[in-house]
Structure formats: structure tokens, C-alpha cells
Amino acid sequence: MSDTLLNPYFGEFGGMYVPEILVPVLKQLEQAFVEAQNDPTFQAEFADLLKNYAGRPTALTLCRNLTKGTKTKLYLKREDLLHGGAHKTNQVLGQILLAKRMGKTRIIAETGAGQHGVATALACAMLDMPCRVYMGAKDVERQSPNVFRMRLMGAEVIPVQKGSCSLKDACCEAMRDWSANYETTHYLLGTAAGPHPFPTIVREFQKMIGEETKRQILEREGRLPDAVIAAVGGGSNAIGMFADFIDESNVRLIGVEPAGKGIETGEHGAPLKHGTTGIYFGMKSPIMQDKDGQIEESYSISAGLDFPSVGPQHAYLNEIGRAEYVSITDEEALNAFQELAKHEGIIPALESSHALAYALKLIKQNPEKEQLLVVNLSGRGDKDIFTVDKILTEKGMK
């Protein structure tokens, strides 16, 4: 792999572990990406779509009520306000422009919560590209509003009935399709994971989240935050937030994995802290696997965090100690979901609720501490209201 244009590794993590047939395809993608990054016309078109179609820059909102009685200032980076309802739209626009540049005529994608699927469907509709989205059958059931949105915008949604019927199985099916149709098809991967160059492409097409946050917080507070906090599944919203702060050594980078029903139960999605390094989904990264190397089922109340591995740059940031990775249970995320809705009038995605829950935990631990925190509110919670309603009804909490 010494003949790649960009470094395919982050420390020991990353790489390009794919069938031989896909290696030239990935190298073609890398070449097109490097050229596009240096092409002012491509950059201008991408910037125009982000501004006039997606609605960037997104707001940085101060929480007025959640921190009452404490000395914390808590800001939310409002990716939930982006067209499509989540941060996913950013990099989808970039990748489809890249696919068109490469002469591809068809887009495929995988989706968990459905947010990446919706972003892919809306961008394909606008940029006139046929689109197929693979989605675990379990996720099709629990994210029905997003399935309807995708189909409404012309996408073909394929429920995947294999394995755990969740995101990892959708990823495998998308890979199979791509292997068979790579000449005409671009696989629009939804997170900062997978084989090189996807982790780098996705980070570069998401890093405006952190760049905008830095500008906005300096404008509002005259200083950088003490910590930026983001949920981590595959890791795209978090790396988008972290990228511009990595060199700011005084800013803590905190990634929040799903602890599900509790780490001790084994029903979680926290491979960074509770997995082991292995090869999965075309990359070397921490994964949830048994002693024989078989991939274990991940679990989270949040479909978008229900993934047994994590992007290689997060693995590297964890290893070198630049970022901290913690975990939050379903119950803690549910509480944060309700708190934000009740006190700030914002309904967050269950994914983002994990990051918010950790911020609230930090504040509660030391209410007298003067601190400036930013949570990446990666998506809105419309898609989750039926899931939450059902859980609260079952618990008799309504």
C-alpha cells in the first residue's frame, strides 16, 4: 500500500483490507478526492451546496435552562438544523459530487438510524442520481419515518434480513453490491470508518463542523471551549467536530460510546474501550469480537450507534491519549433526550443524547466549576419519538 497518495493509516489503525478487485477502485477514489480537494471549481460547488441547499453554517446555541444553578456554559452545535436533520448531509454532498466527477452513474449506501440514508436520498434526488440504500430489517422497523422519507425521495430501500439485521449487516450487503458493480457504482459510505480512503474523505467533508464551532465560540465567548463532546458510533460527527481542535491542546476531546444496557451485560456498542483490535469492514480497528475472532453483536437504543467497530482515527486518538472515550447507557441517554426537550425546546436524536448525557454528568459532578462545554447535537430526534414513546409507555413513565 506504499503507492497510495495519502497515508492509509492512523498509527497502526486503518488500512485497505478489501478483496483485491476493489483495491484499484479505492485508489481511483483516492486520486479523484485528492484532485477535487485541489480544484477550486469543485470546492466552490461544494461550498455553494452546503450554504444554499443544506443551510450552513449551523447555529451554536447556548442552553439557557439546563445549566441553571451551575457555573457551566453549555453550547450546542446545531447539526440538527441542517437539511435532512443531521450532520450526514455534509459529507454526502461531497461524495456525490466526487462520484459524478468519476463518471459513476449509481449510488449505494448503508444506513442505521436512517439519517445517512435520508441524506443520501435527498442529495441523489437533487443531483439526479439513482440511489439504493441497504438497511438492517430491525432498523427498517424502528426507523419507519426515515424509511418513508427515503422512498418518498426516490431511493430504493433494501431491508437486510441477515445476521442481527442491523447496521453491520447493511454494511456487508452494500460491500457485496459494490464488489459486483464498482464500474458504474459509488459506495457512499456513511461514517468515518471502512477502508482507506473513506475515513479521510469523510473527515475532510465533515470538518466544517469543528471549524464553524471554533469561529462561533471565539465570537461569542472570546475563548476556546474547555471540552467538545460528541457521540461515537462509526465516528463521523465526532471526527468532524474534533478535527479542527486536535492541535488545541487545552481543549478536551470527549467521544461518547453507547453503553447500551450496561457494559457489564455485554449488550453495548463500545468497542473503543471494551473491544480488541482486529480486521473488520475493510480496516484495522477496535472491534467487538469473541476469542475466536467472530464479530459480536453490538447493541444500542440508538440505531446510529449500533455498530461493532469504530473509525481508525478515533482508535489512534484514543491510543495516543489526545481524545477521551467514555460511555453512556440507554437510560442516561433517554433522560438527556427528555431533559433537553423539556428545558430547551429542542428534541435531540438519541445518538446526540449520549453526548448530551455525558455533558450533563460532567456538570452535575462539579456544579461550582466554571467551564465552557460544546456538545455536537448531531441530529434531530423526530425519527426517535416513536421509540421513546414506546419505552416510556412500557416503563409507565408517561
Curated annotation (Swiss-Prot):
State if NAD is listed as a keyword: no
Q: Which GO terms describe its molecular function?
A: tryptophan synthase activity
Q: In which pathway does it act?
A: Amino-acid biosynthesis; L-tryptophan biosynthesis; L-tryptophan from chorismate: step 5/5
Identify the cofactor(s). pyridoxal 5'-phosphate
Pfam families found in the cross-reference section: PALP (PF00291)
Q: From the record, give the cysteines joined by S-S bonds.
A: none
Sorted alphabetically, which keywords does the UniProt record give? Amino-acid biosynthesis, Aromatic amino acid biosynthesis, Lyase, Pyridoxal phosphate, Tryptophan biosynthesis
This protein's assembly is summarised as:
Tetramer of two alpha and two beta chains.
Family the UniProt entry places it in: Belongs to the TrpB family.
Function of this protein? Answer: The beta subunit is responsible for the synthesis of L-tryptophan from indole and L-serine.
Q: What is this protein called?
A: Tryptophan synthase beta chain
Gene name? trpB
